[in-house]
Amino acid sequence: MPPKQAPSKKAENKRKEKVIEDKTFGLKNKKGNKNQKFVAQIENQVRNNNTRMDLVRQQEAAKKKEKDELLDIQNLLKPVEQKVAKDVDPKSLLCVFFKQGLCGKGAKCKFSHDLAVAQKTAKKNLYADSREVEKDETNENWDKEKLDEVVNKKNKGGHVIDIVCKYFLEAVENNKYGWFWECPNGGDKCQYRHCLPEGYVLKKDRKAMEAQKEDEISIEELVEKERAALNSKDLTKLTLQTFVAWKKKKLKERKEKEEADLKAKKEKIKSGKHNGMSGRDLFLFDANLINNDDDEAGDIEMEKEEVDENEKVFEIDANFFKFDGMDDELTNQMSNSTAAVSSVAGAVAKMDINEDLFDIDEDVGDLDSDSDED
């Protein structure tokens, strides 16, 4: 008789689950620590043939470590994927893996497997005539036909004219110029140049530049446009009058603030509170507080700042903030002081001065002679 077949793995696992369920009936839902340990022990005995739990955990940790190491090696040996811009056709680029003989995608590869694709996609230079002989080219590699061609061209005077070929310009404007384009005026024997001069702008590019200039606006127009977009009801238009009024308001506020701070500092010093006061404030209000502060501090020395007599200073007088339709207390004060000075000067001018009082030359001479005699 043939031997009995061993039970399948699926049937064996089902049997083990049945045994575990029978032995742990009513214990899985209990949250006690002892019950949970007992359930885990029963599951280990049935599933792992009574293998120790710590050995099972060690085996699982070893498998996980081996898997992680394999994953790290794969990441290190993973080739760099070739990238391409969105607006570039991948078939116009050579596959870097195919160039090294490593690409296994074959026809499914999105990059080109043609080694000459770079030459096919390269555009012909519009600013260099391909017919012109290079500067470093010599007659060492010329054959008999090339030599005869050069001699005949020199004898006939068939030199290239500096004028650009009209057929070349037409082909460039219509995007027909390329590696396989031939000039209708004799092909390579055309005496006109087949290259654009330096700085030349094509008509199609010129139109695009003009259209772009039309869309552009000057900085003045941009400023006016942004100003027009603002809500004029909530904002004040900036003029000379509004600026001067704002400046005077700020000066007045600054003066009031300085007076208030000065008053607060005076009250603070009177009350004997010097905390938070700078040395300059203490010296201005009461210099004795500084002089008598410490006898061992030494004498107080002050250095006078040097003033450059040739330095020009921008003076701001009452006329700087003056304009029609605006009251100015500073103007009134200065006008009153000016009138007072002028009245005093007029009174002094009208006074009778006895010039004999200042004629002391003779007396001075007598004094000098007396001193000499002594």
Swiss-Prot record:
Domain of life assignment: Eukaryota
Q: Which SMART domains match?
A: ZnF_C3H1
Give an example GO cellular component term for this record: cytosol
Record's keyword terms, sorted: Metal-binding, Repeat, Zinc, Zinc-finger
Kindly list the ranges of residues that form C3H1-type zinc fingers according to the record: 89-116, 167-197
Molecular function per GO: zinc ion binding
Query: Is Zinc there in the keyword field?
Result: yes
Q: Which GO terms describe its biological process?
A: cytoplasmic translation
Matching entries from InterPro entries are given as: ZC3H15/TMA46_C, Znf_CCCH, Znf_CCCH_sf
Q: Name one Pfam family in it.
A: zf-CCCH
Nuclease: is it a keyword of this entry?
no
State the similarity comment.
Answer: Belongs to the ZC3H15/TMA46 family.
**Protein's name in the database:** Zinc finger CCCH domain-containing protein 15 homolog
